[in-house]
């Protein structure tokens, strides 16, 4: 039986990583013949079949037009918006290619005009299709925005006609029939939000956590024992981690909140060089960090999971100051490496970090509370922090390990296929 996993990207961003992990799980099950289809190509049996340059360039030109239109939206410009008024011809073609009655289409993050709302409506309306739709953000039940503004109820009540583009996109989504689609979300927070939403409140929704490879993301004792020497910092240095695909550019990742909190913490410390801020996810160091006065190390863009695991093992604590996370991939990977996490007590991160067990959760989005939690970790002994890390790994293995997630995923695939298709 074929399982076709659809995603805008094969590798860039947390949603692509989650989709690729689903491919990894499906590939290990001999019942399924799986592949991952993206704008840039198809990954099948470990081989990448690239889309033509013309196909990619044509798609990017459509993306550009769509993106230009988003500048007329009345939303907060800090929140990503997508219209999905165009399709990737490559994705549509390969999604239908070789399809059989037993094929399952697993749609992941398909914004950036991977599949248009018009094509999604046709696909979802077809009762012969077997579809799993995984939400990686709030776009499917909002209008154009990927996350509803904090305390906004538009996704529940609808959008004002004065906001023409958002109103138009939301009305297009209202015409989509989700009855034939099984929807999954990675966290309880996203489940509750989707169930409250005007568009998905009557839909069939299940929690399918993101899979964490706990064989790769694990404690590396040799790396941890030599971390200060590897980084060239004092043996008593306290190493704080922060990472995001776009570095500090994306305001949803909360880098500004972390900087303000660190400024408060460092103002009470004489030897600021003992504090190390290690960043990753962008090649350039954010200029705002230079004013902190502490030791800054930027690891750049990390595309290899093994290298990422090493970085988590360098840290005393990983800080995830995001204003919103549908899941919290970085937090889960860090805990799997036995590195505790500080975050805000909000959104999907609450499924991952347990306050005073595997990390500390600050009051949303209080700089003072975040600073207090950083200071609390700094004042702990290494042994006390290690207990947090051990608890975190236990939780990740139990909730997001291969055995648990694959069981849920395979049951959903078989459920979508229908009892009559069971072999």
Predicted regions and their residues:
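A short helix/loop element that forms part of the nucleotide-sugar donor recognition site in Leloir-type
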Residues: 218-233
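A charged, aromatic-enriched C-terminal amphipathic alpha-helix characteristic of glycosyltransferases
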Residues: 386-414
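Aromatic "clamp/platform" in nucleotide-sugar-dependent glycosyltransferases that forms part
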Residues: 323
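Conserved donor-binding/catalytic core segment of Leloir-type glycosyltransferases
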Residues: 184, 234-253, 259-262
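Short hydrophobic beta-strand element within catalytic cores of glycosyltransferases
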Residues: 340-343, 353
